[in-house]
Design a protein with these regions (language model features):
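Aromatic/hydrophobic pocket-lining residues that form the small-molecule binding cavity
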Residues: 1, 31, 66, 107, ...
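Active-site-adjacent beta->alpha loops and helix N-cap segments on the catalytic face
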Residues: 27-33
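Residue-level structural signal for beta-strand termini and adjacent loop
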Residues: 30, 226, 253-255
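Radical SAM enzyme core and accessory elements
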Residues: 230-259
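Hydrophobic positions in alpha-helices of CheY-like receiver
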Residues: 34-38, 111-114
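Short amphipathic alpha-helices and their capping/turn segments at secondary-structure boundaries
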Residues: 2-6, 35-36, 64-77, 139-149
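Radical SAM enzyme [4Fe-4S]-AdoMet core and its adjacent flexible, acidic
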Residues: 91-105, 112-231
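Core AdoMet radical
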Residues: 11-27, 41-68, 73-107, 120-126, ...
């Protein structure tokens, strides 16, 4: 891990994101350990990607189970909490994130609580059919983010992995590939959303991997992408440290390995 951090530091990395293939807040002590290890490298921006479900979860005594951890993480340098969503409607988010529950979390209250603890908040909205799939839905999501005082809002369309086979389970057909195939937006839909953002907002920057950052009536908005390979790019998009000690630069391809 130290070697990965040193390489990131030498490469001019400014942002560290704690994330995973599962939900990181299930393992709060692990987050604390990584933040402790990161502290000596003094990266300017440290972020946590989460579904947000445990942020305001209470135990049987009514205590917030992550309150002390969140306060510690903030002291250790965690600056941004990015919450994954598919919409601002609770029922839409419930279908994806808590289908086993009757209700989704109170998202506005979660955002407010994180702000009270001193964190900035990003909503990372995955665009999919039946959810955020049109310019109108994008504008409504932007209005919601502005009303909640969200610092950053990112739109990322569902993208199709290169293979229908899970590389970790060669005998199983990858159900996530099937879901992505059935729910990804068309190129026409994405184009119309980009054109709407160009009309509504001001382009602030275009990142090397193709993401575009806008100011839309005072709201920071990023139209991003995922699972994109740009072999001719002059810089890496990611340096990804895996728990097994390997350092990679792409989530999807096992051949994208540095250490």
């Amino acid at each position: 891990f130290d070697k990965a951090c040193r390489l990131a530091q030498l490469s001019g990395v400014t942002t560290v994101m704690l994330t995973g293939k599962g939900e990181p807040t299930i393992f709060p002590s692990q987050i604390s350990s990584y933040l402790e290890a990161l502290k000596k490298y003094n990266f300017p921006l440290v972020e946590l990607q989460t579904n947000g479900l445990l942020i305001r979860e209470r135990d049987s005594s009514g205590n917030l189970i992550l309150e002390n951890a969140l306060k510690m993480w903030h002291q250790l340098g965690l600056s941004m909490v990015a919450i994954s969503v598919v919409h601002h409607y609770p029922e839409h988010n419930r279908k994806i994130y808590t289908p086993h529950r009757k209700e989704y979390i109170d998202l506005p209250a979660t955002i407010k609580y994180l702000h009270e603890l001193g964190f900035s908040v990003r909503l990372s909205c995955v665009m999919a059919k039946g959810y955020v799939e049109s310019p109108e839905a994008v504008e409504n999501m932007i209005n919601f983010a502005r009303q909640q005082g969200v610092e950053q809002l990112t739109f990322t369309p569902v993208n199709l992995p290169a293979s229908a086979i899970d590389p970790d389970n060669h005998d199983a057909y990858d159900k996530h590939w099937v879901w992505a195939s059935d729910n990804m937006l068309s190129s026409k839909q994405i184009k119309s959303i980009r054109e709407e953002l160009d009309d509504m907002g001001v382009r602030l920057m275009e990142l090397s991997h193709g993401a575009i950052v806008y100011d839309v009536r005072g709201q920071n908005v990023c139209l991003s992408n995922c699972l994109v390979v740009k072999p001719d790019a002059s810089e890496l998009r990611n340096l990804i440290f895996f728990p097994d000690g390997h350092l990679r630069y792409h989530w999807q391809f096992s051949g994208a390995i540095l250490l």
